Amino acid sequence: MENLIDVANGKALADIVLKNGYVINVFTEEIIQTDVAIIGNRIAALGDYEGKQTIDCTGKYIAPGFIDAHMHIESAMVTPLEFSKYAVAKGTTTIFADPHELVNVLGQKGLDFMLTSIEETPMTTHIMMPSCVPATDIDTNGAGEILAADMAPYLENKQVFGLAEMMGLMMWSRLTRKYWISWHFLKTKL
């Protein structure tokens, strides 16, 4: 943090300065022609700065990496590495992936595959823990169930970010009855 402040205050050189580019400010919806001072993998400041390396961005646009907050890599029918090549090329640098389709077919082996595979991608991938395996109680996946106790060890994994979507109207109905939640109350709130 101290290095960022020193660069921003002009007391230290940035590692890289992107010169003369157009910065897309996604918060204010403005496009500003300015320089971007970078130290390490962080933006230190915008404005007139000097750096150890300068990249001329004349006529180019500089934007933050995009974040896809909910997606299913396996729906693209490619590996995480192959998916990331296309996503990164279009500006997506971070995704939150729910691998429930793969996990519903392969069980924990599918989840383990996904966690191992995302390590080799050039983007940040957070895995959301599939919450409904199998997805319905009228279909069996052959790989068994993943219950809360099965999820516990995965919560220690830094790549597992949270709990994924709850699927299936019948499952919701069963859970509401099991825990005495009024289905009528839920229907009126939906």
Residue positions per predicted region:
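Histidine-rich, glycine-flanked metal-binding segment
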Residues: M1-P64
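Conserved protein kinase catalytic core
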Residues: V26, P64, E74-A76, A97, ...
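Generic detector of well-ordered alpha-helical packing
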Residues: V26, C57, A69-M71, S75, ...
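Divalent metal-coordination and catalytic microenvironments
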Residues: G21, N41, G59, H70, ...
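Divalent-metal coordination cores built from histidine and acidic residues
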Residues: L4-V7, S84-L190
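Hydrophobic "anchor" residues on beta-strands that sit immediately upstream
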Residues: I16, P64-F66, T94, F161
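Glycine-rich, phosphate-binding/catalytic loops in enzymes
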Residues: T54-I55, F83-K85
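Di-metal (Zn2+ and/or Mg2+/Mn2+) metal-binding site signature of metallo-dependent hydrolases
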Residues: K60-E82
